């Protein structure tokens, strides 16, 4: 499982000109799933993302987590995080999970974040979405549950 985590002052996702998910201060998470991901990958990513200390404390040091500041989460499915561009000029997506598995794990991720008391907005799985964000920093972190990077 891969995630691009961006610290934002606000973010929203629209489908067909309708806003379907919106947050204020918090994290925008673009979430990708691969073939062998399972619930343990979701647990790893939830723990890591909710507890990443990437918000400033009173001394302007990145020392506070989303949980510490009571921030919000906007989660958007993103199969293109598994795009392979090593050959040719068009990415291949064979490393992305099949939609059934990806959607199940995406929904599990959202549920587990909500179960932790986080306000969560979402995109729409497999839809063409417009994502707007106001980066704060900017701070952008790449995560991979297999710890590839």
Swiss-Prot record:
Q: Which UniProt keywords apply?
A: Cytoplasm, Hydrolase, RNA-binding, tRNA-binding
**Compartment(s) where it occurs, according to its Swiss-Prot or TrEMBL record:** Cytoplasm
Enzyme class, UniProt record, top EC level:
hydrolase
Question: In which residues does the motif Gly-cisPro motif, important for rejection of L-amino acids occur?
Answer: 137-138
Q: A Gene Ontology CC term for this entry?
A: cytoplasm
Q: Which residues form the signal peptide?
A: none
What the protein does comes down to:
An aminoacyl-tRNA editing enzyme that deacylates mischarged D-aminoacyl-tRNAs. Also deacylates mischarged glycyl-tRNA(Ala), protecting cells against glycine mischarging by AlaRS. Acts via tRNA-based rather than protein-based catalysis; rejects L-amino acids rather than detecting D-amino acids in the active site. By recycling D-aminoacyl-tRNA to D-amino acids and free tRNA molecules, this enzyme counteracts the toxicity associated with the formation of D-aminoacyl-tRNA entities in vivo and helps enforce protein L-homochirality.
- Name-wise, this protein is D-aminoacyl-tRNA deacylase
């Amino acid at each position: 499982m891969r995630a691009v985590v961006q610290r934002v002052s606000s973010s929203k996702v629209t489908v067909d000109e309708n806003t379907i998910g919106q947050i204020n201060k918090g994290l925008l998470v673009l979430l990708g799933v691969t073939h062998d991901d399972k619930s343990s990958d979701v647990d790893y990513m939830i723990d890591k993302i909710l507890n990443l200390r990437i918000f400033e404390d009173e001394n302007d040091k990145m020392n506070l987590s989303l949980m510490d500041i009571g921030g919000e989460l906007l989660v958007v499915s993103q199969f293109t995080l598994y795009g392979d561009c090593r050959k040719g000029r068009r990415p291949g997506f064979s490393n992305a999970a099949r939609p059934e598995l990806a959607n199940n794990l995406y929904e599990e991720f959202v549920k587990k974040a909500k179960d932790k008391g986080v306000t969560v907005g979402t995109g729409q799985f497999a839809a063409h979405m417009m994502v707007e964000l106001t980066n704060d920093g900017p701070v952008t972190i790449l995560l991979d549950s297999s710890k590839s990077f």
